[in-house]
């Protein structure tokens, strides 16, 4: 329960009639406070963010949802409502990888509506994915980012991870039922290439066993960027990519050492068979490649080969925004704004080593074995890769696609011996990448992009998203960006800067003006009515006073009650027609105006916050860096 956010409770108690039973029942409730203290949606409302830019405030909710009461397991979420609705309602759920890396990376450095100008100022992200879709960022599994759990209760396999996520979604939709019928897209990057297919499969199973009175969740697509999906192909791609990009010279001493290690890796991959997502012998291949690049205290950045980093990190200090993000998310006013539970006693960290050490998934099959069934079940999948990433490089992604069998074909076969062509993608006159598609699977390679594509190219990434989601803005107007595949524009999507210049927004502004005039007009009407009533009452008392003077009025048996002084009458007038009541009426009427942005949350904006603020841990170290790069390497 948050100490920094005033909560409302739903108390629905039915007491047994028997006295002894009532006491037993009460003791049971006291032993389980959650049985009577339930949060509602307004408890998660984010009133504002410190340092947010000027302009319309985005509608946000954030906070913790308990998924495991026995071990205090809580997942943190941050939700943004979409800015516009194109042709249907959609929700994109974003997950970062690791395992154990926070989805606040995605929220504040990639696809969220804000980015940090510095450690205290937010600016709009011109390529935010919330333009035509609701965005839900979740720190998962338990122990990741703002999420927390008892230290001995981390998840160890991908199946339990997915089960916990189903519990989270079920409870989240109970809080926010208005989104349960949305088209749902599971999106993320890196190790989320394991999370996403497992969660999708768990949702499919849930829908199959669903009682008739519950809502099926409509998973309409999976989106995985630079994903860790198929260790067999992707571990082997390290050397291939290193040779291709000139990182390592064939037959060099370093190359020979890496080749020898790759042989051990291949043997281990054969030994583990269908299992094996994290193989230490294969991780060593990457370490040897990076060792060859260490010069003068620097080494290659494995997430963006165009950059270097300190020799003990090799990319773990990247991207450059991470320092500002860490400082911002540890600020007490930000912690309060995001409704962080007081049970979360340590400060936010990008990646949790405890989660990474425990989620080794030794008994879980790689997600590549789940993708064919999902594709054949009718769920479209989009895989995209930045071509300057080494750790989850595009060569490995292309190899896993080429070897994957689904829907009576292998890879991008259109028919036996015929492969789907690659299409050139040009964005605003510049080569952006290539598209390839067949049998429900789409692949996009981004030119000159790193491990975190939306960090480098936010607007291009949203153009890709809008195409995949089937966003069509022809019905609402607007000026789309010039995005062409093989010279053709295709479906019209909008990826312009915020605020989006659409006719829908112009109509919304016009509605705001009309609502404002109506609110003020109603307030004026009510004020006139109040004045008229007050004038009538005043006239009545004047008339009675004259009657008394003329002796024509009957005197009551309690004459003192009739002797209103001029001062008391003045007080009476001020209460009936004073500024206080007129402003109260105005606020009520102007709710119509504010509801255009806030909808049902208008009452929440007026809530106050109380309680104390617990100080976060001062431990500000970047937990990703470690002495053993092989063990603590993160697939973010």
From Swiss-Prot:
One of its GO terms (molecular function) is serine-type carboxypeptidase activity. Residues 544-636 are cytoplasmic. It is an enzyme of class 3 (hydrolase). GO terms for cellular component: membrane; trans-Golgi network. Residues 575-636 are annotated as: Disordered. Keywords: Apoptosis, Carboxypeptidase, Glycoprotein, Golgi apparatus, Hydrolase, Membrane, Protease, Signal, Transmembrane, Transmembrane helix. Residues 1-38 form the signal peptide. The chain crosses the membrane at residues 523-543. Its EC number is 3.4.16.6. Belongs to the peptidase S10 family. Protease with a carboxypeptidase B-like function involved in the C-terminal processing of the lysine and arginine residues from protein precursors. Promotes cell fusion and is involved in the programmed cell death. This is Pheromone-processing carboxypeptidase KEX1. It comes from Arthroderma otae (strain ATCC MYA-4605 / CBS 113480) (Microsporum canis). The gene is KEX1.
